[in-house]
Curated annotation (Swiss-Prot):
Homo- and heterodimer with other ZFHD proteins. Interacts with MIF1 and MIF2; these interactions prevent nuclear localization and DNA-binding to inhibit transcription regulation activity. Binds to ZHD2, ZHD3, ZHD4, ZHD5, ZHD6, ZHD7, ZHD8, ZHD9, ZHD10 and ZHD11. NCBIfam families: homeo_ZF_HD, ZF_HD_prot_N. It is found in: Nucleus. It comes from Arabidopsis thaliana. PANTHER family: ZINC-FINGER HOMEODOMAIN PROTEIN 1, ZINC-FINGER HOMEODOMAIN PROTEIN 2. The homeodomain differs form the typical one by having namely 4 instead of 3 extra amino acids inserted in the loop between helix 1 and helix 2. One of its GO terms (biological process) is regulation of DNA-templated transcription. The record marks L243 as: Required for DNA-binding. GO terms for cellular component: nucleus. This is Zinc-finger homeodomain protein 1. A zinc finger (ZF-HD dimerization-type) spans 75-124.
Length: 279
């Protein structure tokens, strides 16, 4: 009886060992399974259609993948006009857009370098150069000598001029001299200068007035100037300009009005008075 019990116990232990061995083999099978990328379907790991806008950085600029077609473009230098308030044009020098926040936030549309919106930066689209097919000319007939093709002149690539601060052109100061007015002719646009012409009487009266008031118009002479302008028909501004222009020429030269004849010398005393004075 004891021998049979021992055999039964041995059989049970062997069965338990076999079960443990099978469980270990199952664990090894789990570890030896293919990686997750092989188990999952390919459509779940790779997406060929992108909706919306995604951004990727690095590689010479901030790249944005837009739309389902996969068009990619980068945002380069900032083109915002910083001198628009003064009527000029100047940029801040930011050469590349760098987002100031995480994608999906408002700060992602703001540049961390210059603080401007992303729309102010130049959007650079990828350029794909497609070389046109080269058509070879047909071979020349026998006995025909072909001259070499002339070297075609290729103009140098146009270089964009540097950005400069464009200020509004200064307004041309108008001459306050009404004697020298200019008017454009109707056809050719050539300006012809007109000078105010004075009569001889007006010149004499202006010269006399100038010597009287000292070649300057002062406040105490307002009544005299106003009466003179009414009598002669010369505007006040024209008279003022005439005094300024002729002060150094006519003011120094002796006036013809002052060329008075010298008074005659006194007559000589008669000898009659001298004889009376003598004792």
């Amino acid at each position: 009886m004891e021998f049979e019990d021992n055999n039964n116990n041995n059989d049970e232990e062997q069965e338990e060992d076999m079960n443990l061995h099978e469980e270990e083999e199952d664990d090894d099978a789990v570890y030896d399974s293919p990686p997750l990328s092989r188990v999952l379907p390919k459509a779940s790991t790779e997406s060929h259609e992108t909706t919306g806008t995604t951004s990727t950085g690095g590689g010479g600029g901030f790249m944005v993948v837009h739309g389902g077609g996969g068009s990619r473009f980068r945002f380069r230098e900032c083109l915002k006009n910083q001198a628009v308030n003064i009527g000029g044009h100047a940029v801040d020098g930011c050469g590349e857009f760098m987002p100031a926040g995480i994608e999906g936030t408002i700060d992602a549309l703001k540049c961390a370098a210059c603080g401007c919106h992303r729309n102010f930066h130049r959007k650079e689209l990828p350029y794909f150069h497609h070389a046109p097919p080269q058509h070879q000319p047909p071979p020349p007939p026998p006995g025909f000598y072909r001259l070499p093709a002339p070297v075609s002149y290729r103009p140098p690539p146009s270089q964009a001029p540097p950005l400069q601060l464009a200020l509004p052109p200064p307004q041309r100061e108008r001459s306050e001299d009404p004697m020298e007015t200019s008017s454009a002719e109707a056809g050719g646009g050539i300006r012809k200068r007109h000078r105010t012409k004075f009569t001889a009487e007006q010149k004499e009266r202006m010269l006399a007035l100038a010597e009287r008031i000292g070649w300057r118009i002062q406040r105490q002479d307002d009544e005299v100037i106003q009466r003179f302008c009414q009598e002669t028909g010369v505007p006040r501004q024209v008279l003022k300009v005439w005094l300024h222009n002729n002060k150094h020429t006519l003011g120094k030269s002796p006036s013809p009005l002052h060329h008075h004849q010298a008074p005659p010398p006194p007559p000589p005393q008669s000898s009659f008075h001298h004889e009376q004075d003598q004792p």
